């Protein structure tokens, strides 16, 4: 077989071994396996209704939970085709030349959507444009049907003049369409552009013409919602997310607990209390918050002692969230990195190879942690001013969401002790301020290793998180892998039960870390232990 060497084929010609699929396996989060076909999200709405805001925010969320998503903004394509914007006349429905250009831009954008979803491993594409006519939406539906894409429409409806004016002044004044123009001229031209679109605008009709489509109408920035014919899991998650976000001004403060006794010793995990300097930080944090004069501030902590002790010093009510607890290091809890490297050298190497996907034996991975923290993100999106006192890995995951960081960067984000991250949501992202309180603390950050393996050396086999792929371009059936501590429940033969009680037998080759090098990860068919 292709997975065996020539010597193995000669000595064991009767034996077939599964090919090594791990080196070519695409890194993908759990959520990607919940999409059974690519989805095209189509934005609808007049200009200045927050479509781009929703597109970017939704894309950031979907990428964070592990669904590869990309925005295709039609304005970018239009500015490539027409280098200089002159006035609202370009958007008149009776400007035939401009209409041809706009349609051609849409077709080019859809071709890029097709390439992303079919050739670049994308799962969801967001088509950010007005799409206000039925003709344009029918064209998109035909395109999706030809390529077997699901379609979900998101229509933003707003008739509040104050909201529209604020959106124009906050976002459109800085648009590439208006270089070096004053606010009054921008407002006048853009309002006329909106009037051009109103002439041909046909909102989605849930009672007749569009009753069979899947969509959500977001009315007046989330005051009301209308949801129609949600098709699948991903669409339901999109609806749930859009029903939780808001645009009211607020500030989110993220910080770690004060320095703990285990921090001083270099140990990970555990439930130790604050050190002397950690208690000093808690007092400094209280003084900082009093100076900020924040109204209606909510304080959240984990259920571990070090975050609770930090919050206790603030003298304000706080809520404890178990899902804010630090990443579970399993068998490595309360150990230093030097101890882990000495006792479990292969585990130490595995984590350095792929920190986001690596799961501690009996513990969690960063990927697991993102799944665990999703309810926190939903609640943060619903809230006003919040202070979250958490832990290094937890804070990295939360920061990655707000700063739109990918799986490669997430585990290495710097979140030092005794430092506050002040996050202020803005039009298309998040403004970040780093505030260091004047209290010394140990450095718990580990830089990303180089991982420069020699060309003739195969990296240590990666133990992946448990999943069952729903589909694969590879025709060879992959073995189902289970993480340590998560093996399937099934009756054990007396011999197997005895093996488990007495430890590894002579048939089971051992690694330096004590794990079987053949069946690690467990349940591989080629392992003689099975």
Curated annotation (Swiss-Prot):
Its EC number is 2.7.1.105, 3.1.3.46. The modification Phosphothreonine is found at residues 468, 475. GO terms for molecular function: 6-phosphofructo-2-kinase activity; ATP binding; fructose-2,6-bisphosphate 2-phosphatase activity. Residues 1-15, 450-476 have a biased composition (Polar residues). Beta-D-fructose 6-phosphate binds at residues 78, 102, 130, 136, 172, 193, 197. The keyword Oxidoreductase does not apply. Residues 1-21, 446-512 are annotated as: Disordered. Residues 2-248 are annotated as: 6-phosphofructo-2-kinase. The modification Phosphoserine is found at residues 29, 466, 483, 493. Residues 249-530 are annotated as: Fructose-2,6-bisphosphatase. ATP binds at residues 45-53, 167-172, 348-351, 392-396, 428. Beta-D-fructose 2,6-bisphosphate binds at residues 256, 269, 337, 351, 355, 366, 392, 396. Phosphorylation results in the activation of the kinase activity. One of its GO terms (cellular component) is cytosol. One of its GO terms (biological process) is fructose metabolic process. The active site is at 128, 158, 257 (tele-phosphohistidine intermediate), 326 (proton donor/acceptor). Phosphorylation by AMPK stimulates activity. The modification N-acetylserine is found at residue 2. SMART domains: PGAM. SUPFAM superfamilies: P-loop containing nucleoside triphosphate hydrolases, Phosphoglycerate mutase-like. The record marks 256, 391 as: Transition state stabilizer. It catalyses: beta-D-fructose 2,6-bisphosphate + H2O = beta-D-fructose 6-phosphate + phosphate; beta-D-fructose 6-phosphate + ATP = beta-D-fructose 2,6-bisphosphate + ADP + H(+). Homodimer. Forms a heterodimer with PFKFB3. Synthesis and degradation of fructose 2,6-bisphosphate. This is 6-phosphofructo-2-kinase/fructose-2,6-bisphosphatase 2.
